[in-house]
Amino acid sequence: KEGYLVNHSTGCKYECFKLGDNDYCLRECRQGYGKGAGGYCYAFGCWCTHLYEQAVVWPLPKKTCNA
């Protein structure tokens, strides 16, 4: 599974500005989904890869980003 890393309290994607390989996104994806996850910056959001099927990614149901 793949998807955008989401902040569960705000419903927003994690923003990033250095597109492609991005240490911040990789670190945040691994922290949120486990050390087997990958991550990079895609369309100014942290995109996480190699997630388990039940992983919760953006958008959250019934929660829109209100940042």
From Swiss-Prot:
GO CC terms of this entry: extracellular region
Domain called LCN-type CS-alpha/beta: residue spans: 1-66
Cysteine pairings via disulfide bonds: C12-C65, C16-C41, C25-C46, C29-C48
Tissue: Expressed by the venom gland.
One annotated GO biological process: defense response
InterPro entries named among the record's database cross-references: LCN-type_CS_alpha_beta_dom, Scorpion_toxin-like, Scorpion_toxin-like_sf, Scorpion_toxinL
Domain of life assignment: Eukaryota
Keyword check for Secreted: yes
GO molecular function ontology, one term from the record: sodium channel inhibitor activity
Keywords: Disulfide bond, Ion channel impairing toxin, Neurotoxin, Secreted, Toxin, Voltage-gated sodium channel impairing toxin
Keyword Metal-binding attached: no
PROSITE patterns per UniProt: LCN_CSAB (PS51863)
Compartment(s) where it occurs, according to its Swiss-Prot or TrEMBL record: Secreted
Role noted for this protein: Beta toxins bind at site-4 of sodium channels and shift the voltage of activation toward more negative potentials thereby affecting sodium channel activation and promoting spontaneous and repetitive firing. This toxin is active against mammals and lethal to mice. Selectively modulates Nav1.4/SCN4A, a sodium channel present in both denervated and innervated skeletal muscle.
Family: Belongs to the long (4 C-C) scorpion toxin superfamily. Sodium channel inhibitor family. Beta subfamily.
Misc note: Is neutralized by the single-chain antibody fragment 10FG2.
Domain topic, free-text comment: Has the structural arrangement of an alpha-helix connected to antiparallel beta-sheets by disulfide bonds (CS-alpha/beta).
Protein name (record): Beta-mammal toxin CeII9
Organism per entry: Centruroides elegans
